[in-house]
A protein has these predicted regions:
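Active-site nucleotide/adenylate-binding loops and adjacent lid/helix of ATP-dependent enzymes
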Residues: 1-3, 57, 98-190
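ATP-binding N-terminal substructure of ATP-dependent carboxylate-amine bond-forming enzymes
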Residues: 1-107, 111, 122-136, 313-326
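ATP-dependent carboxylate activation and anion-phosphoryl transfer catalytic cores
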Residues: 2, 240-326
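Hydrophobic beta-strand scaffold residues
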Residues: 31, 87-88, 116, 145, ...
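Short, flexible, mixed-charge acidic loops at enzyme active sites
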Residues: 46-48, 79-83, 219-226, 282
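A glycine- and small-aliphatic-rich helix-loop capping segment at beta-alpha/alpha-beta transitions
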Residues: 79-88, 163-168, 299
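Phosphate-binding site of ATP-dependent enzymes
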Residues: 162-249, 270, 274-276
Length: 326
């Protein structure tokens, strides 16, 4: 089990890893911990770990990356695990990279005609040298808007701008995290999330769940996601039968079109019968309060059994893909 990592979501990863460790033990698996320090060193039993291509990782049957953000969820670690020739849970290199980049993912979904909120990708260089043009393009999205680093999750670095004066500082804040940002129009309705699991071509989809924020919370921020009592998950979501089927079908389509494998959580905005895709997370949170496991639990799959299934899916994919490796 890999946890920690170099990103700003290091602590979230450790919390997710603690939950996964317990669940794997309950499912009858022995978990071997590898913690990736903030500086990038891989540690096992307190000692720095070295790896050799083609030799696996500590004799593990399967690797479970419980890593969030850059250098973990973006295809980098997945590429290393491919070099080690070891089965691993979750999406491969390409799908991980595509889904981690919010702008690239949205452009892929737009090319497939998937309905989404309005958005604009902005680079730091363009913001610095073409500020007036960027401000005009952002204005088309209306207000309020949400400004996000392009490749972070867990609501890290997100700023809600409610007037024109707040747009510039919001972009400046995003660029303290990375050199690319995404600006998204606000969406009406409720936030609905759906968990997906299985092979790329034939995934299973959970019952959709509705995010209900604690009183006074303006939007689904980091505290709402990870602090006890920050939000309530209502399953099944209180949406129409038509919206429910649209959410589940779009979750399946987003998973398949982006080439995902193993698992994902897909997030939507639902207003009456209008369903808009928000984003897809290839390694969603696995803490006690995280939505991914709760949705499967409400769909009849207990947490330890879920982890066991994910490990089995990873092993099956590795066995299948070995046919094409020469």
């Amino acid at each position: 089990m890999l946890c920690g990592g170099r990103s700003s979501e290091h602590d979230v990863s450790l919390a997710s890893g603690a939950s996964v460790r317990v669940g794997l033990a309950q499912a009858g698996h022995e978990a071997i911990d590898v913690c990736i320090a903030r500086g990038g060193a891989w540690l096992h039993d307190g000692a720095e770990l070295s790896v050799t291509p083609g030799r696996g990782l500590l004799g593990a049957d399967v690797v479970f990356p419980v890593l969030h953000g850059p250098f973990g969820e973006d295809g980098t670690v997945q590429g290393l695990l491919e070099c080690l020739d070891v089965p691993y849970v979750g999406a491969g290199v390409l799908a991980s990279a595509v889904c981690m980049d919010k702008v690239v993912f949205k452009e892929l979904m737009a090319s497939a005609g998937v309905p989404q909120v309005g958005y604009l990708g902005v680079t730091e260089a363009r913001w610095r040298f073409e500020r007036d043009a960027v401000e005009r393009e952002v204005a088309v999205l209306g207000l309020p808007i949400f400004v996000k680093p392009a490749s972070l999750g867990s609501s890290v670095g997100i700023v809600k701008a409610e007037d024109d004066a707040a747009v510039g500082p919001a972009l400046d804040a995003a660029f303290t995290h990375e050199g690319r940002a995404i600006v998204e129009a606000a969406a009406a309705g409720m936030e609905v999330e759906c968990s997906v699991m299985g092979p790329t071509a034939a995934p299973e989809v959970s019952e959709p769940g509705e995010i209900v924020l604690r009183r006074g919370a303006g939007w689904y921020d980091f505290e709402a996601k990870y602090e006890p009592g920050g939000m309530e998950l209502v399953v099944p979501a209180r949406i129409s039968a038509g919206a429910r089927e649209a959410v589940r079908e779009l979750a399946r389509e987003a998973f398949t079109r982006s080439g995902c494998h193993g698992l994902a959580r897909v997030d939507f905005f639902v207003d009456a019968d209008e369903v808009l895709l928000n984003e897809l997370n290839t390694i969603p949170g696995f803490t006690e309060t995280s939505v991914f496991g709760k949705l499967w639990g409400a769909s009849g799959l207990p947490y330890p059994d879920l982890l066991d299934r994910l490990a089995s899916i990873a092993v099956a994919r590795h066995r299948e893909e070995r046919r094409y490796r020469h």
